[in-house]
């Protein structure tokens, strides 16, 4: 668990990386506390007026990358490499709110496929699906924002992976749950809070 101080530092680091990269095409080396030296999963989400503007990250800890390095890469990628959106332009920087989700270790959901909705807690769990070559991930805050129940969460997870919305009922579909700590700006460039969604 990160403290609010560390979470604030994570969000401010993400913003600094984004602003510098969008303006110059590069970003400077930065220093973070030892908390960020370990490997860890992280996502950076950008929004303008509560509309998604970019979201990229690492669902699993990377052996060759610290949490701090993953954070910086996810921030830069959310601004410039999300295939759903054009690159963030420097004119947008003062409109963008930055959110950082630090992910817990994903755990395989071990139950019969039709029982999966009963083992998912909205507001606590994020989901990952692996279905053959298809993979998809939805962060814990997504079903809360869209007012989905657990079944709708699973269906939309399948759609995110590019498969049929009912593929989650198949044995070959592997579903993983994970927790997350969410830190976000209250306004673009403003104070950072830990977002509670449960």
From Swiss-Prot:
Entry-linked Pfam families: AMMECR1
HAMAP family, sorted: AMMECR1 (MF_00645)
Signal peptide: none
The name this protein goes by in its record: Protein UNCMA_24250
Residues in AMMECR1 domain copies: 5-194
NCBIfam families tied to this protein: AmmeMemoSam_A, TIGR00296 family protein
PROSITE patterns in the cross-refs: AMMECR1
InterPro entries hit by this protein: AMMECR1, AMMECR1_dom_sf, AMMECR1_domain, AMMECR1_N, AmmeMemoSam_A, Uncharacterised_MJ0810
